């Protein structure tokens, strides 16, 4: 997404915040918690909440290094004292959830509506605590058409409401 902004393929992108991007304006617009998902018959499936350290013995399905959320999840695991064994790495949230549903491992993912329709158990992460912020991203210091600026203003207004809850 960020690369698409830089090449002017996109006027606006919605994604996680990336470090070391001085030419990009990141405006927070929504938040989302991270959860652990496990297959329905997994030994952890009866848990309501979990310390991420308790997940380290199990194979994980993770996000690839190209994913914006990967550094955040890695940081959470380092806070817990270790990194999980990655059975598979993919880029998209839904692909991670699909591999977990098929029994290929467990995963830390954003809490998203599709999880309710998949054969996985959703477990709240008690430690470490964290929430994901989504950003509206645009290039700084470039001309933007009036319609783009109007859309940015609309999103900012809606974001104020979303971020209060």
Residue spans for each PLM region:
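Flexible hinge/capping segments at coil-to-helix
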Residues: 21-60, 145-146
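Residues embedded in well-ordered beta-strands
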Residues: 35-37, 43, 106, 133-137
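Short beta-strand-to-loop elements that line the ligand-binding cleft
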Residues: 16-17, 83-92
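Secondary-structure junction motif
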Residues: 59-80, 144-152, 159-163
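Thr-Gly-centered strand-to-loop micro-motif
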Residues: 39, 63-64, 86, 109-110
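Short beta-strand-centered segments that line the small-molecule binding cleft or hinge
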Residues: 1-38, 96, 100-104, 120-125
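A late-sequence structural motif
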Residues: 122-164
